From Swiss-Prot:
Belongs to the bacterial ribosomal protein bL20 family. Binds directly to 23S ribosomal RNA and is necessary for the in vitro assembly process of the 50S ribosomal subunit. It is not involved in the protein synthesizing functions of that subunit. It comes from Prochlorococcus marinus (strain MIT 9301). Keywords: Ribonucleoprotein, Ribosomal protein, RNA-binding, rRNA-binding. Gene3D superfamilies: 6.10.160.10, Ribosomal protein L20. Signal peptide: none annotated. GO terms for molecular function: rRNA binding; structural constituent of ribosome. One of its GO terms (cellular component) is ribosome. One of its GO terms (biological process) is translation. This is Large ribosomal subunit protein bL20. NCBIfam families: rplT_bact.
Amino acid sequence: MARVKRGNIARKRRNKILNLAKGFIGGNKNLFRTANQRVMKALCNAYRDRRRRKRDFRRLWISRINASARINGTNYSKLINGMKNAEIIINRKMLAQLALNDPKCFEKIVSSVSN
């Protein structure tokens, strides 16, 4: 039976991990075992944070909308409820952009909702 040599396969597997570990500090980029641990941790963090990013941005938009709504004499809850009743369909991202970049337009939306 022929002898099985796995040097190439093992090297490719290790190099794949070490390439993912580029930019890490110290032995975390050079030593396979620590690099492997760091890469696994980094991939777990990336997976978790891709989901967390969606929550964080929604929280940021709501905070911005609430701050601008309070400047205009209402609050976030009343503004969103009024928009639903008035059938004004603008998502929170766009509403936050309006509040930040075009306060006069945001003020018109608030006044149309509060009437």
